Regions:
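Beta-rich interaction/scaffold domains
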Residues: 1-81
Length: 81
């Protein structure tokens, strides 16, 4: 893999924040409330998988993964109804 620039790493971290927000909002009922359960579940599952992949990257330095790890835990425990 090509080494990432600091800007690319920052963009990846920002994208992780977007996934965290979406997972939390779907679970709280603040996003996708009008979508069916299967679509909400798929959204949470995809974003949780994205976070799991990104947290495992070896290029992070002092970025906090607390919110990402919490969203992963919440996403893995989520069952849409």
């Amino acid at each position: 893999m090509t080494d990432l620039t600091a800007e690319q790493i920052a963009q990846n971290y920002s994208a992780m924040g977007d996934s965290v927000a979406l997972i939390n909002d779907v679970i709280a009922g603040n996003a996708m409330a009008d979508d069916d359960a299967a679509d909400r579940q798929d959204c949470v599952d995809r974003n949780t998988q994205h976070l799991e992949l990104m947290v495992a990257k070896d290029y992070w330095t002092d970025e906090s993964m607390t919110a990402a790890n919490a969203a992963i835990t919440a996403g893995n425990g989520y069952t849409a109804s």
